[in-house]
A protein has these predicted regions:
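Residues forming the flavin
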Residues: 1-37, 42, 120-379
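Generic structural signal for well-ordered, non-membrane alpha-helical segments
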Residues: 32, 36, 60, 64, ...
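Immediate flanking context of iron-sulfur cluster ligation sites
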Residues: 32-53, 76-100
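Functionally engaged cysteine thiol sites
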Residues: 46-49, 97, 105, 276, ...
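Iron-sulfur cluster-binding cysteine motifs and their immediate structural context
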Residues: 48-73, 94-123, 170, 174-177, ...
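Short microdomains enriched in Cys/His and/or Lys/Arg
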Residues: 69-89, 117-136, 141
Length: 379
């Protein structure tokens, strides 16, 4: 524990976000960087609890109190070593993880939690800047060949671990970019794609082979897969959308998020869609159905494309600002969350059930819905 009184002396201060009036005109990431003093102050707030519940919240089991201690001491390389012992890609999780560790932080019982996610991002960014994160090719090879099907975060992590164990690893990706939803789903304003490309380039230097446009079972048979590799690791992503089977669903103008977001990400990589297939919010009145993170990603993208107005509708009731009694710490808090996209504008509404869409000549004009009331079930 670096500073026993740190949590009493310093408050939670995340990195400052860029002004909304500036950032809605570009796709650059939201946040400014901390100074050394600011970062160390945030690290000092960690209490190094006897039972660190942040470990329970973190799916990776990150050794959070230890890297917070090193950050407070200004020992950034040591902090990085601790972080990399459990997390293959802290530069990803430090940007887009929902941070369940913070929800489980003991400080959050009656105060604001430690800024764990932002500390993680700062450690990894400094690691790359200082040259501490570098290729780690295996010293010996086993002679075994492994195929990893899918190049999202789980596929990349599996490939890195298998390669470091000495196996010859080939990652097969059906899309045109390595990275899965990191490249084609998450908007650039949350995860700059140079961050993903930097990691992929480093993994190539470690000896991992990447192949795009390989769709197993479509243009690459299972027989070929089984015949060419000693082992196969399936890490396919979750790109199958949940549809809304209501009248008018097939009208032109009703789209899945995974039809909309990847197009914009490809545009930023210099690949424009076919004019007949292009989806843009420019000058349009937009409705987003779904109040979660994906909906917020669509909201931020619509702002940047120049939408006239954006409404985001959620079927469930508006969450409370603070934890209700039936949602105690250290459970994940079911509370109202305001993302950077919500700060930028748009209107949110709750208890909205979509009944149908209507339009003229096959083009969407109206959404028809009702307001619902949620009541406890009879017991």
């Amino acid at each position: 524990m670096g500073k026993p009184t740190g949590f009493m002396e310093s408050g939670r201060t995340p990195p400052e976000r860029r002004a909304t009036t500036e950032r809605i005109y570009d796709y650059n990431e939201y946040y400014h960087r901390w100074s050394d003093t600011e970062a160390q102050e945030q690290g000092s707030r960690c209490m190094d609890c006897a039972v660190p519940f942040c470990h329970m919240g973190c799916p990776l089991g990150n050794v959070i109190p230890e890297f917070n201690h090193h950050v407070y001491k200004g020992e950034w390389e040591k902090a990085l070593k601790v972080l990399l012992s459990t997390n293959n890609f802290p530069e990803f999780t430090g940007r887009i993880c929902p941070a369940p560790c913070e929800a489980s932080c003991v400080l959050s019982i009656n105060s604001d939690p430690v800024t764990i996610e932002y500390i993680e991002k700062e450690i990894s960014d400094r690691g790359f800047e200082q040259g501490w994160i570098k290729p780690e090719p295996p010293t010996t090879r086993t002679g075994k060949k492994v195929a990893v099907v899918g190049s999202g975060p789980s596929g990349l992590a599996a490939a890195q671990q298998l390669n470091r164990a000495g196996h010859k690893v080939t990652v097969l990706e059906r899309a045109d970019y390595i990275g899965g939803l990191l490249m084609l789903g998450i908007p650039d304003f949350k995860l700059d794609k140079t961050v993903v490309k930097r990691r992929v380039a480093l993994m190539e230097k470690e000896g991992i082979e990447f192949k795009t446009g390989v769709n197993v079972g479509v243009n690459f048979s299972v027989t070929e897969l089984l015949g060419n590799y000693d082992a196969i690791c399936l890490t396919g992503g979750s790109t199958e959308a949940r549809d809304l089977p209501v009248p008018g669903r097939d009208l032109d103008g009703v789209h899945f998020a995974m039809e909309y977001l990847p197009q914009q990400n490809r545009r930023l990589q210099g690949v424009d869609p076919n004019a007949n297939d292009a989806i843009t919010a420019e000058g349009k009145r937009v409705v987003i159905l779904g109040g979660g993170d994906t909906g917020a990603d669509c909201l931020g993208t619509a702002h940047r494309q120049g939408a006239e107005i954006v409404h985001q509708y959620e079927l469930l009731p508006e969450p409370p600002v603070e934890r209700p009694e039936n949602n105690p710490w250290p459970q994940w808090p079911s509370i109202l969350r305001t993302s950077g996209a919500h700060e930028e504008g748009g209107l949110r509404d709750y208890n909205i059930l979509t009944k149908s869409f209507s339009g003229t000549d096959g083009k969407l004009e109206k959404l028809h819905g009702v307001r619902v009331e949620w009541t406890p079930a009879d017991t």
